[in-house]
Amino acid sequence: MEALLNSIPDYAKDLKLNLSAVLKQAELTEQQTWGTAVASAIASRGSEVTRAILAEAQLHLTPEALNAAKAASAIMGMNNIYYRFHHLSGNEAYSSIPARLRMQVIRTHGADPVDFELWCTAVSALNGCGTCVASHEKVLREKGMKEEAIIASVRIASVVHAVAAVLESEAAQRSL
């Protein structure tokens, strides 16, 4: 992680400091923190950020939790687009049409169900699906998770996403 932090340019110093801070939030367990970071890095599509976070996450997560975090990002990558269309179209008829999309991993991921739900919430926020955010956030609160913990995961998603964008733009500039 140190190499990743050092690769963040000076103009994004706030992001560098924020990344260090959001990975140490007291509101989240180690598994919640690193699962959120993994799911968010993958959803952000930044190869440098994803490599660094996956490498560090292996020190903090069981193989099952790591795979579940990856699965949360994968399934939300599909669901967030599908359900965002429902919301954005404004056409209620779409809600009555079966999705016909396989989503078994939501039940078979093998991680703590609340943690998986948290990772899905963070990725849904990152992907901008209001319907999915509302649905997952509601489940988390019903299962007893405090708003402070939920927003802590969204902090991770927002910072990881921003760092990924910065580093991808820096890589593009270097290739000029």
Locate the predicted segments by residue.
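Hydrophobic alpha-helical segments
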Residues: 1-176
